[in-house]
């Protein structure tokens, strides 16, 4: 059976849409009529996906990490209960409240019922199920332990979401503070300063240097503020476009890695992802070289990716994993020692997991320390700027009071 998306009218003339399974479009139309619906459009999901791909869509946005973790966890639980895979996919699709996810799962189930493996069926949605996900599912299907593999994938997605949530929560306060500070300074320069200082200019009073500087800044902001904002947005767009060029992105990422604080954070994030992903791959009986290739895909820094791919080539030529990674000079000594211990004891999976946990904790600690320093410094800078504006605005008034008191 195939999956079809339909648009129909009910007895009251209201539009309805959804996903239904059937052998062909005619059968689906008949089933809709039996439900007192007038079919307006019935399209097989695979045909619709092909149309969408030609137009540049078809799940290119993917789905959120929490949604992926949820459907993976639900599927793992149902597979563990002994239900046939087709019924598990149907149940998860019916439980989903989001039409996009429901449509995707029904289409995946349709391919599974046609005889395709689950990993092949998921391959139609590469922006939702990445290579790590599909490779592990394929390994689970071959080994007969699909349920445990899905559980590990759900844990992996949930851990990534937790780390992302912690980082986002830590960044909320500084970002709000920056926006608030910029807003206050812009308001003072654009609205308050011209009205107060302008009175002294009209009186012909000589202004202190700080006040004159403030007035010039206010005039510049009023005349060129919008152009400056547009230019800034264009610059951001240009930088993002340039970073899509592989050679420029590689040089940029190499520079990022060499920075004092940001570089340490970037190394910690990428090495932790590598260790955790490789741990999951080895636990799913994926060969070490294939696991390294999959782990590289989840890393975000192109320079780190390049170095790890070179390390994978060294492993292929017979080097140990520890020595190959040590040559990159990107992995912390503790992680390298734990990997060496895992190779010698045959417990590489467990040691990689512990190394990833340690690196995650170190990453979180580094971020907290950096934000702990940055936030007070930002508050002090904001207070200094506001104080400068207030004092520069009040200085002509104080000078006038001194002249009048003499």
From Swiss-Prot:
Spans within the Cytoplasmic topological domain: 1-171, 245-368
Chain ranges passing through the membrane: 172-192, 224-244, 369-389
Top-level lineage group: Bacteria
One BP term from GO: protein secretion by the type II secretion system
UniProt key word Calcium: yes
Binding site for Ca(2+): 97, 151, 155
Sequence ranges on the Periplasmic membrane side: 193-223, 390-406
Keywords, sorted A to Z: Calcium, Cell inner membrane, Cell membrane, Membrane, Metal-binding, Protein transport, Transmembrane, Transmembrane helix, Transport
GO cellular component: plasma membrane; type II protein secretion system complex
Subcellular location: Cell inner membrane
UniProt GO MF annotations: metal ion binding
Protein's membrane topology: Multi-pass membrane protein
Biological role stated in the UniProt entry: Component of the type II secretion system inner membrane complex required for the energy-dependent secretion of extracellular factors such as proteases and toxins from the periplasm.
NCBIfam families with a match to the protein in the record: GspF
Entry similarity comment: Belongs to the GSP F family.
Quaternary structure and interacting proteins, as annotated: Type II secretion system is composed of four main components: the outer membrane complex, the inner membrane complex, the cytoplasmic secretion ATPase and the periplasm-spanning pseudopilus. Homodimer. Interacts with EpsE/GspE and EpsL/GspL components.
Name by which UniProt lists this protein: Type II secretion system protein F
The species this protein was found in: Vibrio cholerae serotype O1 (strain ATCC 39315 / El Tor Inaba N16961)
Gene field: epsF
């Amino acid at each position: 059976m195939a999956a079809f998306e339909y648009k129909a009218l009910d007895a009251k003339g209201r539009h309805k849409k959804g996903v239904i399974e059937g052998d062909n479009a005619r059968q689906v139309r008949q089933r809709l009529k039996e439900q007192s619906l007038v079919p307006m459009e019935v399209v097989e999901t695979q045909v619709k996906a092909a149309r969408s791909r030609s137009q540049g869509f078809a799940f290119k946005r993917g789905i959120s990490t929490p949604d992926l973790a949820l459907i993976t966890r639900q599927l793992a639980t149902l597979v563990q209960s002994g239900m046939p895979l087709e019924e598990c996919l149907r149940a998860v699709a019916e439980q989903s409240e989001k039409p996009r996810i429901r449509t995707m799962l029904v289409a995946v189930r349709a391919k599974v019922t046609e005889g395709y493996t689950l990993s092949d069926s998921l391959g139609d949605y590469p922006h939702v199920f990445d290579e790590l996900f599909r490779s592990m599912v394929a390994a689970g299907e071959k080994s007969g332990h699909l349920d445990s593999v899905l559980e590990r994938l759900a844990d992996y997605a949930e851990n990534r979401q937790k780390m992302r949530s912690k980082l986002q929560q830590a960044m909320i306060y500084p970002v709000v503070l920056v926006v608030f500070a910029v807003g206050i300074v812009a308001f003072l320069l654009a609205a308050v300063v011209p009205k107060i200082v302008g009175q002294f200019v009209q009186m012909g009073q000589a202004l202190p240097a700080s006040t004159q500087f403030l007035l010039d800044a206010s005039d510049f902001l009023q005349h060129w503020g919008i152009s400056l904002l547009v230019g800034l947005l264009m610059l951001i767009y240009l930088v993002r476009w340039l970073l899509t060029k592989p050679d420029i992105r590689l040089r940029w990422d190499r520079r990022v890695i060499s920075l004092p604080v940001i570089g340490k954070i970037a190394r910690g994030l990428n090495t932790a992802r590598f260790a955790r992903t490789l741990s999951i791959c080895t636990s799913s009986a994926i060969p070490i070289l294939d696991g390294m290739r999959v782990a590289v895909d989840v890393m975000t820094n192109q320079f780190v990716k390049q170095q790890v791919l070179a390390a994978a080539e060294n492993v292929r030529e017979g080097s140990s994993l520890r020595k190959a990674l040590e040559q990159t000079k990107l992995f912390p000594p503790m992680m390298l020692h734990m990997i060496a211990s895992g190779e010698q004891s045959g417990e590489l999976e467990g040691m990689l997991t512990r190394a990833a946990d340690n690196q995650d904790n170190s990453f979180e600690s580094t971020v907290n320390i950096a934000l702990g320093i940055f936030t007070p410094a930002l508050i002090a800078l904001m207070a200094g700027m506001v104080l400068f504006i207030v004092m520069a605005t009040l200085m002509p008034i104080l000078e006038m009071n001194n002249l009048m008191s003499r």
